[in-house]
UniProtKB/Swiss-Prot annotation:
PANTHER family: ADENOSYLCOBINAMIDE-GDP RIBAZOLETRANSFERASE. GO terms for cellular component: plasma membrane. Disulfide bonds: none annotated. Its cofactor is Mg(2+). This is Adenosylcobinamide-GDP ribazoletransferase. GO terms for molecular function: adenosylcobinamide-GDP ribazoletransferase activity; cobalamin 5'-phosphate synthase activity. The chain crosses the membrane at residues 7-27, 39-59, 61-81, 113-133, 143-163, 196-216. Belongs to the CobS family. It catalyses: alpha-ribazole + adenosylcob(III)inamide-GDP = adenosylcob(III)alamin + GMP + H(+); alpha-ribazole 5'-phosphate + adenosylcob(III)inamide-GDP = adenosylcob(III)alamin 5'-phosphate + GMP + H(+). Its EC number is 2.7.8.26.
Length: 257
């Protein structure tokens, strides 16, 4: 029972950190627990994707599919508070508007959104809607699978960067700093097991190719972030999640045609 309660605590901490869903009052959060909660980020993706898929399924019973997709996207934004979208915008602003590493990190930390961030945010949301809408034209039921797989695998991929890259912020004000410390093989194995299980249960014939595509994207993003800022930040993890989610939808659409 103690082990189960401990794992539930870690799951609820991950849920509270990455969503707007409130944690139970008995859950106590500290740096060490948040660090270990990294293992359940994939499950948080499964939760968010499941909520989006449920909203899509309910609304498409009485609304056009395109409108249902918009409601599903809104549900994801409400549940997460636009946490990862904010990271995408900040990353675009930092990498696009800064010359030195220090400038890029300073711009990323600025809460104001710039031109690059606004463009990345608008284009990302538009592309997400278009890809899901095209999937729905081929098979409306496939959108459910896409939402669950996309949200889960993208978070696993984003979290995996922590295990192979250096955290480049040294200020204690960063909310992501505890995630960058003392990661173990256990966290990585649980993350990967979540991805494999969700992909296998989805029954997608192109599941292996999706996994390979995400691995290639991961290498590309690691190279980009290392070249630009020397490692990763919480914002680049958010950007990674968004780009990986879009990549999942794009590959699913390609395999469906």
């Amino acid at each position: 029972m103690h082990v189960l309660r401990q794992q539930l605590t870690l799951f609820f901490i991950a849920m509270g950190f990455f969503t707007r869903i409130p944690m139970p009052t008995w859950v106590k959060v500290d740096g060490e627990s948040l660090n270990k909660a990294n293992r359940y980020f994939g499950l948080i993706g499964l939760l968010v994707g499941g909520i989006c898929a449920l909203v899509y399924e309910i609304t498409r019973g009485f609304l056009p599919v395109s409108v249902s997709i918009i409601f599903a996207m809104i549900a994801g934004l409400v549940v997460t508070g636009g946490f990862h979208e904010d990271g995408l915008a900040d990353t675009a602003d930092g990498l696009g508007g800064g010359w030195s590493v220090a400038d890029k990190l300073k711009i990323m930390k600025d809460s104001r959104i710039g031109t690059y961030g606004a463009l990345a945010l608008v284009m990302g949301l538009m592309l997400k809607f278009i890809l899901l809408s095209e999937l729905a034209l081929y098979n409306p039921d496939l959108v459910v699978t896409a939402l669950i797989v996309g949200h889960t695998l993208s978070r696993v991929m984003a979290a995996s960067l922590i295990f192979s890259q250096s955290y480049v912020r040294d200020d204690d004000s960063s909310k992501s700093k505890p995630l960058a410390q003392n990661q173990t093989v256990n966290e990585l194995l649980i993350l990967l097991a979540t991805a494999v299980l969700v992909l296998w249960c989805s029954g997608l014939s192109g599941g292996l190719y999706i996994a390979i595509g995400l691995v290639l994207l991961r290498w590309g993003l690691i190279y980009l972030f290392h070249r630009q800022i020397g490692g990763y930040t919480g914002d680049t993890l958010g950007a990674t999640q968004q780009l990986a989610e879009l990549a999942c939808y794009l590959m699913l659409l390609g395999f469906s045609l």
